[in-house]
Amino acid sequence: MQLFKETKIILLSSMSSLGSGSPEEIERSWCACVLYCVSKLGNAGKAKEDRGITLRQILRAFDLKIVDFFKEMPQFCIKVGFILTGLYGSDWEKRLELQELQANLVHLCSLGRHYRRAYQELFLLNDGKPANNSSELNVQQASEYYDFGWLLFLVLRNQASSAVKNLLTSTTELVSVLAVLIIHIPVRLRNFSIEDSSCFAKKSDKGVNLIASLCERYLTSEDELSKALQKTNILIKDILKKKPCSDVSECQQGSLSFIDPEGLTFFKNFLEEDSLKSSLQVLEKEYVNGLDTKGELDARMFANEEDSLLGSGSLSGGALKLPGTKRKYDDVMASPTKSTASRAPMSPPRFCPSPNGNSFCNSKMAPFTPVSTAMTTAKWLRSTISPLPSKPSGELLRFFSACDKDVTDDITCRAAIILGAIFTGSSFGERMCTSLRNTSGMDAIWTEQRKMEALKLYYRVLESMCRAESQILSGSNLTSLLSNERFHRCMIACSAELVLATHKTVTMMFPAVLEKTGITAFDLSKVIESFVRHEDSLPRELKRHLNSLEERLLESMAWEKGSSMYNSLIVARPTLSAEINRLGLLAEPMPSLDAIAVHHDISLGGLPPLPFHKQPDKDEVRSPKRACTERRNVLVDNSFRSPVKDAIKSKFLPPLQSAFASPTRPNPAAGGETCAETGIGVFLSKITKLAAIRIKCLCERLQLSQQILERVYSLVQQIISQQTALFFNRHIDQIILCCIYGVAKISQLALTFKEIIFSYRKQSQCKPQVFRSVYVNWPSRSRSGKIGEDHVDIITFYNEVFIPTVKPLLVDLGPGTSPNRNNEPKSGGDAASFPESPRLSRFPNLPDMSPKKVSATHNVYVSPLRSSKMDTLLSPSSKSYYACVGESTHAFQSPSKDLNAINTRLNSGKKVNGRLNFDVVSDLVVARSLSDQNGSSAAAMAVFGTKTPVKGEQQDP
């Protein structure tokens, strides 16, 4: 109750921006979030058996869907984060394990779809009874065999520790369950013919090699599948108490006919009717006991899409989505300029039985599902990366020794430390924080294999980069690059991220590698494009993954507090140093390697001792004091290099060496610029390109004309170059949304914020917190009277921060003509009147006095304009830039909802005690109501002023 009491005031004050439902629904979601936090954070240190309430119980108690819960939880954490810190400590976010739970749900949803498709291809539904005429799988009644297979998989999956729980391993376990079903389900229920060579291509003299055939079809490893099948058989023997059949010849007369029994275990009468029911009961009990112990969500629902708790849509966070939305892929991977907004996961195609009934043989594996992409990239790791040596090649060693000092020992030692920090038990969530020595041998083997894959990939790409750099320099001395600490950490982080992304671990997800390696998002963004360019064999799924990461880095992560981008920006734009220091945005020094080794208890074995007790100054970003006092050429605020000029410069200077050089170091190939100016220029050009793509997509969705689109893009360009501070600690979409509305206002276009938000919700990168929670740091003198850090809705940010900052830029754009929506007639209104602004009515300029009753028939009091407020009022032209009264009185809410709320309160019959507070009623609101009665002229009201409350609109439900 303590957490709810302390957060209740936040709930009441933020009701209009928290959700799109009724107040009761919003309060219900809020209570669910509170209860989940208490159950996770308040029970720390208790035995697992005493953990109490689980998430599935919370969802049922508050009648919430999974998707709805995860849409509101991030916003809840933003609003009450400081309270959670005070109650539960600064590490509450890590202990909450919200991101891990999201990933687990996404994986289970993908695995559930994969299992449904595979089962329907292999076996008849409903125990051979004809299904109904509907083509939708989710309306068909699954058989007990179907339920048994999914339940067997869940029990098998729950036996794995959190360290190795990942989509790739789970898929292999699921295929092992399919193998068990194939050899035990009665032949009459099969949807395939075992003799058909197109179904099971791997054969020998003894019959079909089932394991090899399934590996070929589902892209799994034979070794991994054999190990998973052994685990499944052990589970059947230990939990279900079934004994393997010792007479192979007897078994081959039934389900094992024409199947090579080598490597397979057959349990006689295992799935006969009586045995099946008892086995289901045992598995149900085993799984439920595991749920009560671990407190996880009931994954049985993922075998049935109609489950009431499942819901539909995408999980909050943008990157994590429940599969089910069709998507199209680009054939070309590039920098964010070539990415598209359509990036939602693809839904699996519905199964259509073939005319001859042999669906398994005639259907193809659905491409581009989360499971199939994971298996494809895993095959690349097995076939291309795993066979490579775990040490630098001869050519790479020659590059190391050609430096001013042989850097071989430094590089190998660094790789061991950083990869050891990433691939340890502490890296895989709170549940595994006791390191690998307390995990099972299987976990340690899995982790060591992943570390070796990342190491081999790192050496492979590093060799390719060195080869390319040496060609540019016409020499093999790459000292400045190969001795750069930050560059190597970025390369190792990128390699490890690709390995982790391939296996899709539940607990070690981006940006975890940034924290483990000690780098920032801005650092990693420097190597992504080069990494892709120098690894030709990289699967397109991993290229897309890196592309999506680069977008995330550019859109918000590089702008967050503590980004090394600010350490370069303060050199390139010294005029921004005061604001950067005021907000405390500068990055902390990169932790040394010996500190990382000690923190993660990493043993280097036979490697040489650590030579990294102190990082050389030349490789680190210079401190802001040194950067601001050194003499250098300053990049003019409004100068912006073109891509052509950047391309010309890249021919004369290796981009990686300049990108990771000291910010204050002169760049001889850039006309006297410092490396910071060059790097910031490249970074901001990428920001501009990414913004251009999103502006185009959103404007097209809003059906805005090309002229409006160009104005919005021009405004964003000017903000990037002249008002860069608007992006500090914010998301670029927040600036784009405000630019679209601001341009619509000065272009006299009837476009509301509600329409913009409604269209933005349909964008694949949309996250509700983008428009619900915008960072502001109120100065000592602000219009709102607030001081310090805060998070406000997008409309408050637009009125209080955006417009005062960019108003001169909007004035320069000018109203010009009156562009209209495509396919809509132009309005013939007066050019001097602005859309969404209230009409002004005559109201005499009276001296300060008490409110006066102005109607004999209506209980209406009017507070005349006070002279004390005159200084704060805006001119009519200035008012036109703001979101004004007349559209709504609450954020994202329509006027009709305001009127309904007023009528409801008036008709409730409740007596309100106390006096009215006339200070909260805008004079203009009353003046407008009087003008409707008296027919007063709007023009004569100019003397009154135009102070208006902040516009707000309620989200559509």
UniProtKB/Swiss-Prot annotation:
Coiled-coil spans in chain: none
Location of region: Spacer: 570-677
Region (Domain B): 678-808
InterPro entries assigned: Cyclin-like_sf, RB_A, RB_B, RB_C, RB_fam, RB_N
Primary residence: nucleus
One GO process term, biological-process aspect: cell differentiation
Gene Ontology cellular component terms for the protein in this record: chromatin; nucleus; transcription regulator complex
Location of region: Pocket: 369-808
Location in or out of the cell: Nucleus
The entry's keywords: Cell cycle, Nucleus, Repressor, Transcription, Transcription regulation
Location of the region described as Disordered in the Swiss-Prot/TrEMBL record: 814-854
Family assignment from sequence similarity: Belongs to the retinoblastoma protein (RB) family.
Protein name in UniProt: Retinoblastoma-related protein 1
Organism this protein belongs to: Triticum aestivum (Wheat)
Organism taxonomic ancestry: Eukaryota, Viridiplantae, Streptophyta, Embryophyta, Tracheophyta
